[in-house]
Amino acid sequence: KVSATVNGKETTDITVEKTDSYEGVKLKVYNSGSDGDRVVLKVTWQIQHLLNLYSDIAVLNWFPISDWDKGFGQVDFTVDGLDASQGELYAHAGYFGKDPQVKRTSTGYQVHVDNLPASGKLELHAYWPMTSALRENNQAYLLNKTNKADFLKKEADIKKSKENFRRIFYVILPLVILSF
């Protein structure tokens, strides 16, 4: 479902083209606004079978935003569904951009990103402890191995890589250039 506001007023004068492909779902949204209008889109997805289920945790690894031809001034993303008090969500938007802000809510998580550039990506990476209800209702999808240690190691590696890239790009490279 897609809804829109233009300059703070709700509008139904939008056209949505949805294309399914092997890479995912592509939405194109057209509105009758004018140059300079502030357009806010709200896209609501009811998604099933998006989690990888392990014996100890359920894992979300999803790129809800990728391959855009225009940048976004601001993105707010909500993830609800499993008990947020028991899991952890990490959001990534590349090595050099401002880190997304993740806030735990009573029903899930709120992710906020400022200035996501054209062709930028937003990755959501989360885990929740496996529950007996989730296990019982999804036996066919359950992987018979643990994953929490690997998940946490991957997050630590991402954080370390980001710090290293930023150090090289913002500290070492400028020092090398200044030394010539």
Report each predicted region and the residues it spans.
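Core subunits and conserved enzymes of cellular information-processing
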Residues: 101, 106-109, 117, 171-175
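N-terminal pre-first-transmembrane soluble regions of secretory-pathway and organelle membrane proteins
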Residues: 1-19
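Extended, hydrophilic extramembrane loops/domains of integral membrane proteins
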Residues: 110-156
